[in-house]
Regions:
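Solvent-exposed N-terminal domain segments of exported/luminal and surface proteins
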Residues: 21-269
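Sec/Tat signal peptide C-region and signal peptidase I cleavage site
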Residues: 13-19
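Extended beta-strand-rich segments in extracellular/periplasmic secretory proteins, especially
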Residues: 129, 134, 141-142, 150, ...
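Flexible, processing/modification-adjacent segments and terminal tails
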Residues: 161-202, 264-268, 276-358, 450-461
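Bacterial N-terminal signal peptides
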Residues: 3-13
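Cysteine/selenocysteine-centered motifs that mediate thiol-based redox chemistry or coordinate metal-sulfur cofactors
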Residues: 321-327, 347-348, 415-461
Length: 461
């Protein structure tokens, strides 16, 4: 009897392991079929014991994977890896509007930022770092609450992002909880360094007007788990995160620098400073300046530099959970290749865009002040990354003004995230900012807190 039970147990373990690894097997088969070197390279990045172990630990904690959620859905027969949506077959696909954002549908038929097709790739199992998982496991289910100002507070009344490193509201029940889970993703790592980020200003004829090259830095100032200084950063008390930008070219704006420090207190505005080299002076900005473009000609504003980065305040914004669903979105394979395949001219996509099926929550952020440039932001939040898979920004007339869609540079062996590419499209005026990023993984250790002092940042130019 003992032998029989042992054999049954071993079979169950093997079955569970096999099921949890199926996403890797799917990628192996897919890469063999396409024969594309970038797909083979992605298989090499995920086909190892370290990835399997980390993916399994996150799956065990969540109680699901992207694949298990998709398995519960009745998906169209065509919607599987290898299928390519084109302008020739899209009209024969009655389901396409249920999964593919309108912006991408239009790319198949429009002369503005056109593409040849959208290839479905296998769904990947994403996760964050093990240390973030461990910190989250330590929390009690009711550890956090949201107060009357919309602040995240722990059970002792302290600011949640200051006192804890774990993720809040893993199973969000409403829009406010989902918004804080999204905020907790941050940038998916303790430190971020772009060297460089290229921001191309593109017109309606798909021509490049200007390209800005810059460094972007970001640092989690509290709840650090994976890179020194661990915990909270001395000298930045009350601050949850900091971002900095330094433009390197073109020459007329070289040296433009911005630093933004985010306080946990909803009543304390961001410490937001901008150095303007042509004037040789530093300006103190306010939260409303976050609506301004980062540089002339760009659709990218300070509030959208990581899809959505304005401050949470339930007195100014309403956060509403709309639905759960499935969306086609770019895979986070940027550590190996760019699934958008941005052309060398910086303003076009070179042909076939890769997308995968992702389970998401959709929530809306509604402006209550009637003074913000967007009346609503619609955010599709991934159920594994807890970050935006797609974002729509609605103008004061109720029409879509801009969309944000990006691809991440995700490191499978560690669960760390940075970025690879992004499109910020002004669908109203047919302009776009197309971004390519070189995530400087090898330079993270060189980052210091001095970067987040505007006087010292400007001297780096």
């Amino acid at each position: 009897m003992l032998t029989t039970l042992t054999l049954v147990s071993l079979c169950l373990v093997a079955s569970t392991t096999q099921a949890s690894d199926e996403w890797i097997d799917n990628w192996k088969s897919f890469a063999a079929e396409t024969g594309l070197p970038e797909h083979a390279a992605w298989v090499a990045a995920i086909d190892n014991a370290e990835v399997r172990a980390l993916a399994k630990d996150w799956a065990d904690f969540r109680g699901y994977t992207a694949s298990s959620l998709l398995a519960k859905e009745t998906l169209p027969a065509e919607l599987k890896p290898g299928f390519i949506i084109t302008k020739d077959n899209i009209d024969s696909l009655p389901w396409v509007n249920d999964y593919l954002p309108q912006y991408w549908i239009d790319r198949l038929t429009s002369e503005w930022t056109p593409i040849k097709g959208i290839r479905i790739v296998p769904t990947t199992h994403y996760y964050m770092q093990r240390a973030r998982l461990d910190a989250t496991k330590e929390l009690e289910p009711d550890h956090f609450k949201i107060n009357e100002k919309g602040e995240l507070r722990d059970k002792n009344g302290e600011h949640g992002f200051i006192s804890e490193a774990g993720l809040p509201f893993i199973n969000p029940k409403n829009g406010e909880e989902l918004n804080w889970l999204f905020n907790a993703h941050g940038v998916g790592t303790d430190d971020l360094y772009f060297d460089t980020i290229d921001m191309a200003a593109c017109n309606s004829e798909n021509n490049l007007e200007r390209i800005y090259k810059a460094n972007i830095f970001w640092r989690r100032m509290a709840g650090r788990v994976s890179a020194p200084p661990l915990g909270n950063v001395e000298g930045f008390e009350g601050i949850t995160e900091a971002g900095a930008l330094l433009i390197k070219s073109p020459r007329d704006v070289r040296g433009l620098a911005g630093v933004r420090l985010r306080f946990a207190d909803a009543d304390k505005d961001d410490d937001f400073k901008l150095y303007i080299p042509s004037l040789r002076r530093t300006r103190a900005l306010t939260g409303t300046n976050g609506q301004d473009p980062i540089a002339p000609g760009l659709e990218l504003t300070w509030d959208e530099w990581r899809s959505n980065w304005f401050k949470t305040d339930r007195r100014k914004f309403k956060y509403t959970l709309i639905k759960e669903g499935i969306i086609l979105a770019g895979p986070e394979v940027g550590n190996v290749y760019d699934p958008l395949r941005i052309s060398d001219d910086a303003c076009n996509l070179s042909g076939i865009v890769d997308m995968e099926l992702r389970p998401t929550w959709l929530y809306e952020i509604t402006d209550l002040t009637e003074t913000y440039q967007y009346s609503v932001k619609r955010v599709h939040v991934d159920k594994e990354t807890y970050y935006a898979q797609y974002l729509e920004m609605v103008d004061r007339n109720g029409d879509i003004w801009r969309i944000w869609d990006d691809t991440r540079d995700w490191e499978p062996t560690t669960g760390r995230f940075m970025w690879r590419s992004a499109v910020i499209a002004n669908v109203r005026d047919e302009r776009a900012t197309i971004i390519t990023v070189d995530s400087a993984w090898d330079k993270l250790d060189s980052m210091t807190n001095a970067i987040f002092n505007i006087d010292q940042l400007r001297d780096r130019r």
